[in-house]
Regions:
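Surface beta-loop-beta hairpin patches that serve as ligand-binding interfaces in beta-rich domains
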Residues: 401-469, 479, 723, 729-743
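Acidic Gly/Asp/Thr-rich repetitive segments characteristic of extracellular carbohydrate-active
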Residues: 24-58, 62, 454-495, 524-525
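Residue-level detector of conserved, well-ordered beta-strand and adjacent loop positions
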Residues: 31, 52, 76, 86, ...
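Bacterial Sec-dependent N-terminal signal peptides
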Residues: 1-27
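Glycine- and acidic/polar-rich repeat regions and solenoidal domains
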Residues: 60-61, 87-93, 106-128, 136-404, ...
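Beta-solenoid repeat scaffold
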Residues: 45-53, 57-84, 91-102, 124-129, ...
Length: 743
């Protein structure tokens, strides 16, 4: 039975109404760093330092001052949104009773580990300080694996509100509450009404949007409240909020199509209440993951969540007996009550159960929840330590739990707020109240900053007709803009004497008919650079003019790190005679680059000395990989000496969804049998999280090779024929097969 006496929460001391007191005297306008430093040195309580409108480049602003509760000291923009801080810049501040507002950090990066820091040194922190109405947008180092924090909160009794944090592209937490000294514990911070805008998939651990604490201090109390924030497709990794300390309240936030979960990774006495998770059927969208002791999860709403395993709609994990702080404390004395789950895929109980995580939940409860739709309950261990009572499940659904669930009709309608809602009668049964977002997107973020995205789709721009000839493709690329379409002549002949560099989304294609032939005098035909994305259709790439080098390729990614995810779409192309020397690849993904999607469709590859897709350059075994979604469908591969695909995700990290690979309806003939071929496979997959191979034939080819790692990978190979081809090789039997025929 739940020990209610343990479910207490430390009070949050709200001093923030003090900031409504307005000071307008003693304002000093500063126009450069020298003037700023002089103003800081002499500012008094009640003073204002005003940054002049314009661009401030390569500035490290250090703001040390002490106001009083009735005489705050302000640092602000002359006009909110008109002070643009860029280049190698950052802002740090310490003292007390400070207000910072109206600044925009855009298209730069920090020279240190933090963009906005609530301290100026280890011992000098900010207390009773408010940061409001600021923006950080694309303030990311180009070095994708380099980690930094956009906002680091130290000290106590600080307020971070109505800010917009958008487009973080490199590793590191967007907003982190730091607790590395006593001066920053039991901090009573308030984080509210912020807009956490889209964050691309990082492809590794270290992409959290909000983290409170770390494993080192997870049993210390932070007493931080995060409320009324809007998380908009913050897809960096699967821990959108990573709670890693005790006594925190995560209440009335909205998670819109976020790939990941609100995760109680470490710490106890967490209050998770009144949050809305809107998955809308998008891939990998998750809800709440419960770990540790005395957690309270109540009155949350979950709709259209598709995540599985550790990323389900509601996940209760197994723990480690006598766990060290950096692992998984068992779920004890916790409550999951009065929540609504609609049209979501999975509820996972005892998730992560293995030899180490062998402790199931105990003295916990799961009561008065409404679960409607085709939700699957997965049980991975004994759940007798959870008291199930008063839950409602629609009549068509089922659960392996024997008691505590009553059947009810699937009574769901779209209410006046545009949300799927159970009937009022069902809501009244659990005392949920009206289904309504606690905060809207428009109510969050900096008041002056648009939330409109600048996404450019393929073929959304103008058409550029490209005549046959030497370097005409290069000229067209130089004159193109994002979304443009380069249309080549049917049957034309094109020669490249320089690298074709792609710096924005572009389509190179020919209309239906004879394919134009593209050859190159350079070792690489096309380089996808940072910001680029490429679509090719109805083309013929031929290696006859390529130089006599090992390691040539048709398409590759930048040799330096790219912090903007790219995509590659290949449809109905022909690739021939990549054989002037060894290891001539069609596509090579270099380290430090990442694709949201790669698709190879309805194409033909003949006489290739390298691999078709080489994506094995992330070899540090830290859970880093090269592509999130890979699709190979409807292709013919003949006389390819290496693999059709080699894809590597090393290490044991569980923080990502991908790689996700679909291979269907392909034909392989004499593939993977080159005398210098290193893996000895026609397809090689290491650490892939989800792999489906179907309706594909092999003839006189090397086998498929699998290396399955942790993270509960799902691998299915079905309806395939392997003639004169070796049997599937794997390091363990954690994969499934169906209708695999060997001849």
């Amino acid at each position: 039975m739940l020990k209610n006496s343990k479910l207490h929460f430390y009070p949050v001391v709200l001093f923030f109404a003090l900031f409504s007191y307005s000071q307008t005297s003693n304002a000093e306008l500063v126009k450069n760093l020298e003037q700023f430093n002089k103003a800081v040195a002499k500012v008094k309580p009640g003073g204002e330092i005003v940054l002049a409108d314009g661009t401030w480049s390569d500035v490290e602003l250090v703001f040390k001052a002490k106001g009083t509760p009735k005489k705050l000291i302000e640092l602000k923009a002359q006009t909110p949104g008109k002070v643009i801080i860029t280049g190698q810049s950052n802002l740090s501040f310490s003292g007390e009773y400070l207000v910072i507002s109206g600044l925009v950090f855009k298209d730069g990066s920090t020279p240190t580990g933090e963009v906005v820091s609530f301290r100026t040194s280890k011992d000098d922190v900010a207390n009773h300080t408010r940061v409001t109405n600021i923006v950080i947008d694309n303030f990311s180092t180009v070095d994708r694996p380099m980690s930094d924090l956009w906002v680091a909160m130290y000290g106590k009794n600080n307020h971070f509100d109505h800010n917009s944090l958008v487009n973080k592209r490199n590793r590191g937490v967007t907003l982190a509450v730091r607790m590395n000294t006593e001066a920053s514990r039991k901090n009573n911070h308030l984080i509210e009404y912020n807009y956490f805008g889209p964050r691309q998939i990082l492809g590794s651990n270290g992409g959290e949007t909000l983290r409170i604490g770390t494993s080192h201090f997870s049993r210390e109390y932070s007493n931080t409240t995060a409320q009324y924030n809007y998380f908009d497709r913050t897809n960096g990794e699967h821990e959108i909020i990573s709670n890693k300390s005790s006594g925190n309240s995560l209440i009335k936030n909205v998670f819109f199509e976020t790939q990941g979960t609100l995760t109680m990774r470490h710490g106890h006495f967490t209050k998770v209440e009144g949050n809305y998770f809107l998955g809308n059927g998008k891939p990998n969208t998750g809800g709440i993951r419960i770990i540790n002791e005395s957690q309270s999860v109540s009155n949350n709403y979950m709709y259209g969540l598709t995540g599985t395993r550790l990323r389900g709609a509601l996940v209760i994990m197994n723990g480690v007996p006598n766990s060290p702080p950096n692992r998984y404390d068992p779920v004890i004395d916790s409550a999951m009550n009065n929540n609504i789950v609609i049209d979501s895929s999975f509820i996972e109980l005892g998730a992560g159960s293995d030899e180490e995580r062998s402790a199931p939940p105990t003295t916990s409860e799961f009561k008065n929840n409404i679960i409607l739709g085709n939700t699957v309950f997965n049980l991975y261990d004994d759940m007798s330590g959870i008291d199930f009572k008063g839950n409602l499940l629609n009549e068509e659904a089922s659960t392996p739990i024997k008691s505590g669930f009553a059947s009810t009709p699937y009574d769901v309608t779209v209410n006046k707020y545009g949300l799927k809602s159970p009937s009022k009668a069902l809501l009244d049964k659990i005392g949920f109240g009206e289904v309504k977002l606690p905060v809207t997107k428009a109510e969050t973020g900096a008041s002056f900053y648009s939330k409109k995205e600048a996404i450019v789709a393929f073929q959304s721009g103008k058409t550029i007709n490209v005549k046959s000839g030497t370097d005409t493709i290069l000229t067209a690329l130089d004159n193109s803009s994002a979304g443009d379409v380069l249309v080549l002549e049917n049957g034309g002949k094109y020669l490249l004497t320089k690298f074709a560099e792609v710096h924005h989304p572009i389509t190179i294609m020919a209309k239906k008919g004879d394919k134009p032939v593209i050859r190159s005098l350079k070792p690489n035909f096309i380089n996808i650079e940072n910001g680029g994305a490429l679509e090719v259709e109805n083309l013929w790439f031929d290696g006859a003019e390529s130089p006599d080098y090992k390691g040539n390729n048709i398409i590759n990614t930048s040799s330096t790190s790219m912090n903007i995810n790219y995509s590659l779409s290949v449809r109905n192309i022909k690739v021939t005679d990549l054989d002037v020397n060894g290891y001539f690849y069609f596509f090579k993904a270099n380290a430090g680059t990442f694709a949201d999607s790669i698709e190879i469709l309805d194409s033909e590859f003949i006489n290739i000395t390298g691999a078709i897709l080489q994506m094995n350059r992330e070899v540090d075994d830290l859970g880093v990989y090269s592509v999130e979604n890979l699709t190979i469908s409807g292709n013919t591969f003949k006389d390819v000496k290496e693999e059709v695909v080699t894809l590597y995700r090393g290490g044991f990290d569980e923080s990502t969804f991908g790689p996700i690979v679909t291979i269907t309806d392909n034909k392989l003939s004499n593939v993977g049998k080159g005398s210098t071929h290193r893996s000895g496979a026609s397809m090689y997959f290491h650490g892939v999280q989800k792999l489906n191979i179907s309706d594909t034939t092999w003839d006189n080819s090397a086998p498929v090779s699998l290396y399955l790692t942790n993270g509960e990978p799902v691998t299915m190979i079905k309806d395939v024929v392997m003639k004169d081809t070796g049997k599937i090789r794997a390091n363990n039997d954690g994969y499934k097969t169906k209708n695999v025929t060997y001849k």
